[in-house]
Structure formats: structure tokens, C-alpha cells
């Protein structure tokens, strides 16, 4: 077996499949593009769904890739096991309706055992297969596998929901008896027993059926095009090739671990408890790549996952004695390890470090708050004479503040208490079940549409005209190809079309289809890309249409031009965001409609009013400069040399269109644009908002819509000016300032009146002094409008020696508010209010001299007042 670095293993995989006629698909962003079914790209095949379900026919049906992926359903196991990771690389080879079982198995065996490639010892390889899949069993024997190395497994059938499915055959590497202390042998494989001896390195899925949950597996229909979908974990392959005990002792992780050793002063011991080293090494990889791909820490979705990973890694750093932000210092190491195939981490190093460090500092503050919360729980339990911290409280510390259970146990131990571990585990399990139930499943590929897949006629989109004559080359009605159609809805393909198919965030063209006499025979209501790339026109048929006849295609030119203005404005906006917010503010989605444009971008905070003003100003300046908009067609490498901005995660063909706007913007784009920015006229941002963790959205309008938006604002200002009796709009701010000053004066006068009224009322209340056990106290119900008035009473009470203790209760709305104030050390206001609050079904707390509580049971107010004496 060859000794190879991880970079060499990855490259050898890609090189081998290239020799078998496969196209190498580059790894795409971990953040899915145009796929709302996925939180993360979680497998090598996830980026190829559109090929497998037949939505798009690939240029080459043979594909190979090395795809970064994230799975976070078992975060707690990372660091505990030898092979659990949050981020991993999946190596894959795929056939979309081309080769099948025989080639897939033959080539897999060649790649693994040939001296030219990985050169694995054949006797170390074992294969599992689906019992009914005799073809795979026979093929393995034909390529040279000993029958004793073939294990039937009932679970070897891949399906997730509706869509492509089929048997799979898995390849395992036997690491020997040293990893099988009980000498169980092949039963480990046959009975699917968790073990470290037989390591699964590759799974080959033979996708030959269209799964249908409504029928038994035996009734699944054969796919019109059978596919091969395989996955081999790079980390596992590298561990086997490098003879590592676990995946962490490979060159993918050890450089990170060595850096952690330097930062902590601790040493990684392969045979010891190294969980903290492993957690940090794993999690910083996920954080570096995910943030580099535009995901940012937050409180929901992807953001919550990243925040949880960072906090878990940070806590494990503390276990190693690192008590300051340190994870950001590991980003360059991650970048260097992966640089040969993933240069983006080093390219975005400064931004990634900034986000990680900021989040670490924020967590340090949160952790401090959590310690206060934990200490409060301990104090409450001590007062009640209890000694067990409830599982729900332990879970809240874990989930909200990032406290590991061990830290809570330490705090409990110092206080002579214990932790309800069982209750915590139950709360944790409940959360995991909720997460799994709500997790978006992304495995199903959807049903293949055989009719559309089989339409291979050529169709060309003409960018340069709004009307042309073209031959009708395909008609689809009721999901079948037909020769003619006379009514209803149909889908049409023409040899050439002027209609733009919805793509790249630009909506489709609408328009009409006319016959030779000029009669309208159909209206076009939608245009989408067919699997083989043709423009598929959805039409309402008004008169008979026949195959191979010439028709005139006329788009709604006014509608198209309005969309073009918005699309070009989107490019200007993207450039302005880079200039004003920074290069990290990259496109995360867009929609160029008729009446507006919507642009989503990555940014870690709300855009300020000043920034929005600067962005809007810059876009308008470029419009008024009347910059020429040019489009050129070239190859992808030349386009990148020109400096064209490619959207990360998007796939581009060999030929691409480059759209340049003067020397201000240059992007790859297949959409339609105005010829000069002056055609846009005017640009106005109407809304900016957050739509998810680390993602912002701008809604804007151009041209006539922008003018109308400004006019609406002007009309509103004029109406305000009239109300304020301001002669001119520009005087409105001055008038508003005057009103604000009047309001402040009235509020001040109102507060003074309240104080006088409170003082008058206090005169009566403070006379009602009682005494018990040598303590003078006042306990009374008062009528006030808010809790602040209770504090005013207390302030007045403090001015003179009325009593040692003051207890005031007020019914405000449907709630009860309680204030306790004390002037003596032996009467603790905070403790007393905690004892009184449960009477009104409430909770409270505070300082020795002042405390407050809130409750809901107004019927128990008198009972609370009567109870005061018994507490003294």
C-alpha cells in the first residue's frame, strides 16, 4: 500500500476517474445554492441532485468530485469516537444514465488494488451486498474477490423518500486482530457490530429504481436511466493509508492538534483521553470553511450550528487551560492543510479570523452571565434546603450559555450539591428528537421526467431581438410528446427563441406566439429550462399549433426592459456593497422582477442608515455617469483572468457571458441587461432586513417605481408639514424638535405631580406602622399605574425614619407587583421577597436593601400582606 498525503489521496482519486472519462466537478459551497431542502451540503451527491432527478442533463454523464460536507446531527459524539466529524470530504464517482454495476465494481477494485493507484492488499478488503443483488455478488467474484470476503446484509438498500433508489455494495478495510480484542472476526460485519477493525471506506449505490413510498419495494419501477452514486470518506481513506489509529492522527488534523499543544502547553497522547484536542481540531475546520462560504454564527439555522460548534470548542479549550480567545489563531493552519484544493480559507483568512474572534469574545461574556445564573440556582436551592440541581436547569445552562455538564457539576460539587444527570439526558434527548423531526431532509432526488429527458432537439436563445420567426420543434401536453395541440395548456420548444427562461434570479419573459397571418395562437405565461437545456415555453393555447411549423415569437418588450433595468441595477448594488461594506458582502440570492429587485448578501450585522445612504448614492452616481454595459462570451478561465466575479457555489459551463459596467463592475451572468446605465434612471432602496443568521436582504426599485417611491415619501412629508403647520417641508425637523421639547416639559411636570401625589399618599401609608419582634414595618396595598411609582414610594420612605421595613403591593393590570425595602442588615429585602412571592404565584429577588417581585394571583394580595409579620 502506497504512503500518500491527504492531498495526494484526493488528487489520485480525481485523476483515476478522469482516466475513465469522468469530468471533475469542483467542490461547491457548504451553503446550498437554490436548494431550500438542505441546511448544509451534506454529501458528495447533494450538489448533483439536478442531474439525478433529470432536471438537467449534464454535458458529461460521468462525473467525479471531492466535495466538502457538513453533518451535525451527532455533535456530542465528535471527539469521543475515532471517526465522527462535523465537516468531512466525500470522494465520489457518478454515472448519470451511462455505465452501471459492472464498470462501477470493476473500476472500484482497480483503483483500490492496482499498484498504479492505491495498491491496497486485496486480502484486506471485504464487501457487503444486498442479498437479492446476485449481480453484484457475481461481479465481485469476477474481478477477483474471494467469496469468503463477500457478506450479505439486508440493510444494503439505499432509499430516502421518493426518487432514485437501489441496492448498494460497501467496501471495508480489515485493520487486523489488533483492533478486534475479543476476536469476533467477520461477525462484526455480518451483524453490523460497531468496531474499529473493519473500516467502511466506500459505498457504491446502484440507483436503478424509482422509489415510491406508496408501494412495496418489489413493485418499484425501473428508472428510465440507471445511475451510479458512490461515496468514499477522504478522512477514513487517509487514516487507512497512513496507518493512523484514528482519523485524527492523520495529516488532515495533526497540524491543528500540534498548534493546540503550543497554545495549551498540554501534549496530545494517542492512547490517552484526547477528546478536547479532537473536538477543537474538528470544529475549527467546520467553522473556517462554513464562515468562508458565507455562513455566520447566530441563533437559528446554520448560524445556531456554528455558534454551538464554536462554544463547544471554546469550552474544550478551557479544559486544556486556554482561558482566552484562541480558535481564530488556528484558521491559518486549517487553510494551509487544505490549500492545494481549497484556497478559499487562506484567501478569506482575515474575515474568518475576525468573525471567530468576535464570537469567542461574545461567548466569554455569555459564559460570565451563565456563571451568575448557575450561582443563583445554587443559592435558591440552599435556601430551600435542597441539594440537587434539576435536569432542566442543567440543560438550560448547556443550551443557552454553552455550559458543559461537567462545569455545572463542578459548581454543584463546590456547593456540596449534585446534578440530576438523568433529567439532563432526558431534556437533551427531547431536544435532539425535536431537531431531527424538524430537520429538512435532503436525500430524496425526486422523480425523473422521462418525457422531457428524451427531448434532445436543439434550441437557441437569441439575446439580441424581441421578436423572431422560428420552427416549433417539440410539443408536450399531458406529459407526453404530441404532434399538435389545439387548446388548454402546453409546453413548447422552438429551434430559436427570443424568450428568456427563468434563470440566475431573473424572471422569465411573457409574450405571444403568432402564426404566419399575424393571428395570436398562444400566450406565453412561463419559460423554464428543460433537462437538456432548451427553453420550455408554457403557453395557453388559443388556436391550433402544429409541429415543424413556423411561428413568430414576440416577447412583452416593455416588461423585459423593466426587468433588465433591475438586473443591471443588481450588479451595481453588488459592487457598491463590496466597496462600502467589504468584499465579504457577496451575493447569497437575488430576484430581478418587473417592479422591484431583491438582493440577499452575507453580512454579520444590520446595515446602518449611513451605509445604506452611501450605497444608494454610489449606485445612482454610476447610473448618472451613463456607463456602457457590455457583454462578451469567453471561456471561464479567461473570464476569471479578466477579474469577473463568479458567485461561489454556482456552476458554470465552458463558455460563459461576462457583463461589464464601465470599469465599475464585472460579473459572470447569463441574464439580460440594459445597454447603458442611464436607462435605469433612478435607484432607491426601500427596505433592508435580516433574513437569517449572517444574511441580509435589500429590496429596491428603479426607474418609474423609484420615482413613485420618492413621490410617496414627499407626499407623506407634505402631509406631516401641514399637520405641524410648517410652511415648508424642510422646516419639519425643527417643528418636531419643538414638539419633543414640549413633550419633555409635560413629562417632567407629570412626574412632579406624581411625586407630590405619592408623597401625599405616602403620608397616610407611612403612618400605619406595626411592630413584631422588635422590627418596625409597614405593609400596605397601594393604587399606582406602574411599578416605577412603587420605587417613588420607597424613595420617599427612605428620607425619614418611618420604619425598618417597607412592603408595598399593587395590582397593575392583571398582574401583582411587590416591593420590599429594608434599612437594617438583619432584614434582607431580597430574601424576604422570595419568600412572599409564591403566595401570589410569582417570583422575585433583589438586593438586601431593595427587591421586587411579580405575580399573577391578585386574590392573594391580602394574604401576602398578612404573611409579612410571620417572616420577621
UniProtKB/Swiss-Prot annotation:
Zn(2+) binds at residues 567, 571, 669, 673. Catalyzes the attachment of alanine to tRNA(Ala) in a two-step reaction: alanine is first activated by ATP to form Ala-AMP and then transferred to the acceptor end of tRNA(Ala). Also edits incorrectly charged Ser-tRNA(Ala) and Gly-tRNA(Ala) via its editing domain. InterPro entries: aa-tRNA-synth_II/BPL/LPL (IPR045864), Ala-tRNA-lgiase_IIc (IPR002318), Ala-tRNA-ligase_IIc_anticod-bd (IPR018162), Ala-tRNA-synth_IIc_core (IPR018165), Ala-tRNA-synth_IIc_N (IPR018164), Ala-tRNA_ligase (IPR050058), Ala_tRNA_ligase_euk/bac (IPR023033), DHHA1_dom (IPR003156). It holds the Pfam family tRNA_SAD. Binds 1 zinc ion per subunit. It is an enzyme of class 6 (ligase). GO terms for biological process: alanyl-tRNA aminoacylation. Its main location: cytoplasm. Belongs to the class-II aminoacyl-tRNA synthetase family. One of its GO terms (cellular component) is cytosol. SMART domains: tRNA_SAD. It catalyses: tRNA(Ala) + L-alanine + ATP = L-alanyl-tRNA(Ala) + AMP + diphosphate. Its cofactor is Zn(2+). This is Alanine--tRNA ligase. Consists of three domains; the N-terminal catalytic domain, the editing domain and the C-terminal C-Ala domain. The editing domain removes incorrectly charged amino acids, while the C-Ala domain, along with tRNA(Ala), serves as a bridge to cooperatively bring together the editing and aminoacylation centers thus stimulating deacylation of misacylated tRNAs. GO terms for molecular function: alanine-tRNA ligase activity; aminoacyl-tRNA deacylase activity; ATP binding; catalytic activity, acting on a protein; transferase activity; tRNA binding; zinc ion binding. It comes from the Bacteria. Keywords: Aminoacyl-tRNA synthetase, ATP-binding, Cytoplasm, Ligase, Metal-binding, Nucleotide-binding, Protein biosynthesis, RNA-binding, tRNA-binding, Zinc. PANTHER family: ALANINE--TRNA LIGASE, CYTOPLASMIC (PTHR11777:SF9), ALANYL-TRNA SYNTHETASE (PTHR11777). Its EC number is 6.1.1.7. The gene is alaS. The keyword Metal-binding applies. It is found in: Cytoplasm.
